[in-house]
């Protein structure tokens, strides 16, 4: 289109030039034209034409013919000039085009050569596949070399599974790192061309790994309950016990080359790098067991908690992350380590005993006062528990509603409950509540109603959970920033942001915390007998009939609820099982699997919509001797599988469930998983149980850092007993043979071999420069031709440097014997054990002047 418009423009310009030229010629010949016209007029106006002589007519014809020839001659001449100029211009354009074509031809040749070199010579692997069959169609020589010469039409999955997985990824530019014979390759997949590109990234990954290993980790360490536990001892005993704790902590840190600084009596700061942190992770922080054993020895309730952050951030932010981690560890009950590593999910270690209660009456009173102050500022309160509301959640919701109503009797406070979100076992109790407690039931609203009523200054109370995903109505949390949380579960990293949080993981239930708060209010809280029964049932369920997480304060709260009219018989009737359920539980238990001689795993392909039934099965299995933990696995809906876990004190099912995207308490926890099946979930559960509880061997594998007589050489991997192995590790004579250290030693050996090869090449080159060279030393001779003094190796080295500008180590120079006379002597230079160079020394007599 552009070319056509350009051609039309040229034509118009030329036509305009011709028209202008004709007009100019007319102007130039205007006088001649005027004369011809006058002559014609005279001849025409002559009344007697016969009088027009032949000569006049002939003259007129000559003028006209001359004018025509003159006029058109000029036009032809001008056209010729224009054509000539256009011809020159066109030839110039043709010449330029020929030059461009020649240049393009040369460039095309070079580009073709470069492309061929890229395909065949440069270290870039290129693999072309058939997308339908996922088979290799073509690959360049470098790709063939690194992939070990695969045959054409070979399935890609057989050659490298990681490459095959890139085909189905949804990333815009799928890429991954693959390992091929100790080398790392960056692999890119270009979807539109069905081509893989492989680049050697070994050095890049090594640098990245080294940088990662040197990343700073900051840890906050606290001894839980130390001051409270030591208060009954005298000063000397306190110093002795505290010294034993500190000594154990110091001994634990020493092999990891960390910097330990005591901040106050029970709080410490630890600095170390990522490499040593990984070793701690592999050993699962055995310091927790050591501190627990010391506490058991003195009958103390002292444990250790650590919060570790390892991020490539400023020190200030890193310290904040570490502080958040230690706070999370303490919210979860202490006796554990919380590790927050960049780009990794938060890890939890320890927590093998129930949470130690730090709560005192003073602590409860302070929290009660803070809660009252907040409620006074916000007269309109919306209260909700967790989804799949059960008796413990309902009891805590009612308890908080009663507290809010007591503080603001004239205001409307609301309980948010959706019938479709209730646990099926709760529906009969809920229906009875609606009938029995008319005043309370009037203020029960749905999520949809609440969304229209909540304002910016409204208050939302979240009870019996801290996790946004577990809340009955998570969408309501965005309607106001005024949120309070009261819970007794161990915290996770995904806690709900709040203006006030009262979390006590050592409490039996949220009901226990709220009933204690009632005792510190200025006004008496009016609770009906039926409401007290619901709260009592909540405690009963959370403690499994006062077995787990039960303290004297739990019984105080239960006693108070009994005084308020709680009916234990009615509660028992709510918790009774149907006959069909009992048969189903017994059937499932009869088919259970005992794993690792201590864990019961029950599976069912049936769909159980009632989640509490799964918990009942797990709790029933715990009554069997030698079962330390029970896991009930079943479908609760299409494409959704749940695990209900129960255990005794020594097994922490919470940490197991957290690794499977769940949570809970030390002895009762659960999770829900989507997009999987029973077998996969069971295999995953067994994997985590093995990692956590499988007993290690009495011997350990270590990597020697120096030669040990009768044991092995440097970098050798040997197996020794744990005691001797730990001794060598603490004295920095060995490293634990874990994946990190093995990789580091392998990398060190590869580096040493590379350096050795480079050194040998350098020595061979130096040998070539030294061989057959000659130097001369002029020596003064005695009367009988003997040499005065002695020719030293230092003299030889200095003379060689002077003559040939090569520095020799005189310790590596060797002579066959002592030089005692003039002559030519061979001199050997031992560059390495296997490389020897030889030059010649000419000893001559010094001429006297």
UniProtKB/Swiss-Prot annotation:
Region labeled Large ribosomal subunit protein bL9 — which residues? Answer: 681-849
One Pfam family name is DHHA1
Task: Give yes or no: UniProt keyword tRNA-binding.
Answer: no
Where is the stretch described as Unknown?
Answer: 1-680
Q: Which InterPro entries match?
A: DDH_dom, DHH_sf, DHHA1_dom, GdpP-like_PAS, GGDEF_dom, Oligoribo/pAp-PDE_c-di-AMP_PDE, Ribosomal_bL9/RNase_H1_N, Ribosomal_bL9_bac/chp
Transmembrane is among the record's keywords: yes
Which keywords does UniProt give here? Answer: Cell membrane, Membrane, Ribonucleoprotein, Ribosomal protein, RNA-binding, rRNA-binding, Transmembrane, Transmembrane helix
- Name the SMART domains for this protein: GGDEF
Top-level taxon of origin: Bacteria
Q: How does it sit in the membrane?
A: Multi-pass membrane protein
| GO BP annotations listed | translation
The UniProt entry's GO CC annotations, sorted and at most eight, read: plasma membrane; ribonucleoprotein complex; ribosome
Q: Where is the GGDEF domain?
A: 214-342
Q: Which PANTHER family match?
A: BIFUNCTIONAL OLIGORIBONUCLEASE AND PAP PHOSPHATASE NRNA (PTHR47618), CYCLIC-DI-AMP PHOSPHODIESTERASE GDPP (PTHR47618:SF2)
Q: What else is known?
A: The large N-terminal domain has 2 potential transmembrane regions and a GGDEF domain.
Q: Which family does it belong to?
A: Belongs to the bacterial ribosomal protein bL9 family.
Q: What does this protein do?
A: Binds to the 23S rRNA.
- Please state what the protein is called: Membrane protein-large ribosomal subunit bL9 fusion protein
């Amino acid at each position: 289109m552009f070319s056509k418009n350009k051609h039309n423009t040229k034509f118009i310009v030329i036509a305009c030039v011709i028209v202008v030229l004709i007009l100019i010629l007319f102007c130039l010949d205007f006088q001649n034209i005027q004369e011809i016209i006058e002559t014609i007029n005279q001849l025409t106006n002559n009344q007697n034409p016969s009088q027009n002589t032949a000569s006049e007519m002939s003259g007129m014809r000559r003028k006209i013919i001359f004018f025509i020839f003159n006029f058109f001659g000029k036009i032809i001449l001008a056209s010729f000039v224009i054509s000539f100029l256009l011809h020159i211009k066109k030839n110039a354009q043709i010449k330029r085009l020929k030059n461009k074509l020649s240049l393009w031809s040369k460039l095309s040749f070079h580009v073709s050569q470069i492309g061929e070199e890229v395909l065949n010579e440069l270290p870039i692997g290129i693999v072309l596949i058939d997308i339908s069959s996922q088979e290799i169609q073509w690959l360049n020589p470098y790709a063939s070399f690194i992939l070990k010469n695969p045959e054409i039409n070979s399935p890609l999955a057989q050659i490298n599974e990681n490459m095959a997985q890139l085909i189905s990824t949804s990333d815009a530019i799928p890429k991954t790192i693959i390992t091929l014979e100790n080398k790392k390759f960056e692999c890119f997949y270009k979807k539109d061309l069905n081509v893989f590109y492989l680049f050697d990234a070994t050095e890049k990954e090594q640098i990245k790994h080294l940088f990662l290993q040197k990343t700073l980790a900051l840890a906050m360490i606290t001894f839980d309950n130390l001051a409270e536990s030591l208060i009954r001892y005298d000063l000397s005993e306190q110093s002795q016990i505290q010294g034993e704790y500190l000594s154990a902590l110091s001994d634990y840190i020493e092999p990891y080359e960390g910097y330990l600084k005591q901040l106050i009596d029970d709080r410490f700061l630890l600095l170390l790098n990522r490499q040593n942190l990984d070793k701690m992770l592999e050993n699962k922080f055995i310091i927790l067991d050591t501190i627990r054993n010391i506490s058991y020895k003195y009958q103390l309730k002292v444990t250790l908690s650590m919060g570790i952050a390892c991020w490539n951030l400023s020190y200030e932010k890193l310290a904040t992350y570490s502080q958040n981690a230690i706070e999370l560890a303490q919210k979860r009950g202490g006796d554990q380590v919380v590790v927050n590593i960049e780009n990794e999910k938060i890890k939890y270690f320890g927590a093998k005993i129930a949470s130690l209660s730090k709560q005192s009456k003073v602590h409860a009173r302070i929290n009660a006062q803070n809660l009252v102050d907040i409620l006074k500022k916000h007269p309109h309160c919306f209260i909700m528990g967790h989804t799949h509301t059960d008796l413990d959640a309902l009891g805590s919701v009612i308890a908080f509603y009663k507290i809010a109503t007591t503080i603001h009797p004239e205001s409307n406070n609301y309980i948010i409950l959706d019938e479709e979100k209730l646990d099926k076992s709760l529906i009969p109790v809920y229906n009875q509540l609606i009938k029995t407690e008319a005043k309370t039931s009037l203020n029960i609203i749905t999520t949809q109603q609440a969304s229209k009523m909540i304002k910016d200054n409204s208050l939302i109370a979240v009870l019996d959970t801290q996790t946004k995903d577990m809340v009955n109505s998570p969408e309501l949390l965005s309607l106001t920033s005024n949120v309070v949380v009261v819970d007794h579960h161990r915290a996770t990293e995904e806690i709900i942001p709040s203006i006030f949080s009262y979390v006590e993981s050592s409490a039996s239930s949220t009901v226990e915390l709220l009933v204690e708060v009632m005792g510190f209010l200025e006004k008496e809280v009016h609770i009906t007998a039926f409401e007290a029964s619901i709260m009592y049932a909540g405690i009963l369920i959370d403690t499994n009939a006062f077995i787990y997480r039960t303290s004297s304060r739990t019984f105080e709260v239960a006693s108070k609820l009994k005084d308020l009219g709680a009916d234990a018989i009615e509660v028992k009737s709510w918790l009774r099982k149907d006959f069909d359920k009992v048969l189903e539980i017994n059937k499932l238990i009869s088919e259970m699997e005992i794993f690792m001689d201590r864990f019961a795993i029950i599976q069912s392909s049936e769909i159980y919509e009632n989640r509490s039934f799964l918990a009942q099965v797990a709790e029933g299995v715990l009554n069997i001797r030698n079962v330390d933990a029970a896991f009930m696995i079943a479908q609760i809906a299409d494409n959704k599988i749940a695990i209900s876990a129960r255990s005794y004190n020594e097994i922490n099912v919470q940490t197991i469930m957290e690794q499977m995207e769940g949570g809970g308490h030390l002895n009762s926890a659960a999770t829900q998983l989507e997009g999987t099946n029973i077998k996969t979930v069971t295999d995953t559960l067994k994997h985590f149980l093995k990692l956590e509880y499988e007993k290690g061997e009495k011997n350990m594998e270590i990597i020697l850092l120096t030669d040990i007589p009768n044991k092995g050489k440097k970098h050798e991997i040997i197996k020794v007993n744990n005691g001797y192995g730990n001794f060598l590790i603490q004295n920095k004579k060995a490293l634990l043979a874990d994946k990190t250290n093995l990789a580091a030693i392998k990398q060190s050996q590869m580096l040493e071999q590379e350096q050795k090869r480079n050194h040998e090449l350098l020595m061979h080159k130096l040998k070539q420069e030294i061989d057959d060279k000659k130097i001369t030393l002029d020596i003064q001779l005695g009367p009988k031709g003997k040499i005065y003094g002695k020719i030293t190796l230092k003299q030889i080295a200095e003379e060689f440097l002077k003559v040939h500008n090569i520095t020799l180590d005189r310790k590596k120079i060797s002579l066959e014997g002592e030089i005692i006379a003039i002559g030519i002597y061979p001199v050997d230079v031992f560059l390495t054990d296997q490389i020897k160079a030889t030059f010649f020394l000419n000893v001559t007599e010094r001429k006297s002047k």
